[in-house]
């Protein structure tokens, strides 16, 4: 490498370290744990990670995706509020609902508000990494998709047994006649 390239790389690294913003940086994730099925509990996790070098303050979010009449509330909370979140740590809250009818539901990004420093009056807004839509499967479709398929397996084994038994019986017949001769 020539001298100019080394100096320019050093300057770029130096400038990036000098202008790198310190403080709290939060990542927010809304996670649907299992596949949604009508009449079955649907657990949802809200996870907040602080990947910054400083604590975050006055953290709050509210999620309204599951507050309508199509979902029955079971446990947990669709909102969260914390005073501080230490660097390199995480917090999580859970929500459990039961879908009442099948169909496609649009999901919005849950908005997270927090302050990067304790003295800051300005709130930083972040959105949850989430899904754009969610398909709630009917109970009949779920049972059809996950059943043991007993009839299909029995049919499979009968056809396999026939495919194996016929050549075996012919082979046994010819072997017996070859050894003992054909009876008259």
Curated annotation (Swiss-Prot):
Subcellular locations according to the entry: Endoplasmic reticulum membrane
Q: Which residue spans belong to the Cytoplasmic compartment?
A: 169-184
Q: Which residues form a coiled coil?
A: none
Kindly list the GO CC terms recorded for this protein. Answer: endoplasmic reticulum membrane; phagocytic vesicle
Main subcellular location of this protein, as a coarse class: endoplasmic reticulum
Query: Transmembrane ranges?
Result: 148-168
What is the membrane topology here?
Answer: Single-pass type I membrane protein
What keywords is this UniProt entry annotated with?
Endoplasmic reticulum, Glycoprotein, Membrane, Signal, Transmembrane, Transmembrane helix
Q: Which Pfam families match?
A: TRAP_beta
Instruction: Give the record's glycosylation annotations as residue positions.
Output: 94
Stretches assigned to the Lumenal side: 21-147
Could you say which residues form the signal peptide?
1-20
Chain's role: TRAP proteins are part of a complex whose function is to bind calcium to the ER membrane and thereby regulate the retention of ER resident proteins.
- Record note on quaternary structure: Heterotrimer of TRAP-alpha, TRAP-beta and TRAP-gamma.
Record-stated family: Belongs to the TRAP-beta family.
Its protein name is Translocon-associated protein subunit beta
Naturally occurring in which organism (per UniProt): Dictyostelium discoideum (Social amoeba)
């Amino acid at each position: 490498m020539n001298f100019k390239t080394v100096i320019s790389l050093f300057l770029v690294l130096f400038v990036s370290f000098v202008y790198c913003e310190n403080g709290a940086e939060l990542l927010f994730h809304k996670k649907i744990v299992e596949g949604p099925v009508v009449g079955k509990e649907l657990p949802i996790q809200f996870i907040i990670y602080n990947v910054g070098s400083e604590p975050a303050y006055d953290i709050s979010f509210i999620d309204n995706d599951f507050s309508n009449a199509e979902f029955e509330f079971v446990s947990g909370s669709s909102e969260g509020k914390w005073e501080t979140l230490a660097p390199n740590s995480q917090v999580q809250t859970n929500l459990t609902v039961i879908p009442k009818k099948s169909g496609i539901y649009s999901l919005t990004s849950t908005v997270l508000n927090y302050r990067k420093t304790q003295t800051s009056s300005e709130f930083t807004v972040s959105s949850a990494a989430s899904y754009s839509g969610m398909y709630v499967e009917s109970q009949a479709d779920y049972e059809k998709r996950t059943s043991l398929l007993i009839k299909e397996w029995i049919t499979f084994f009968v056809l396999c047994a026939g495919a194996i038994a016929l050549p075996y019986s012919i082979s046994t017949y010819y072997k017996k006649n070859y050894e003992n001769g054909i009876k008259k």
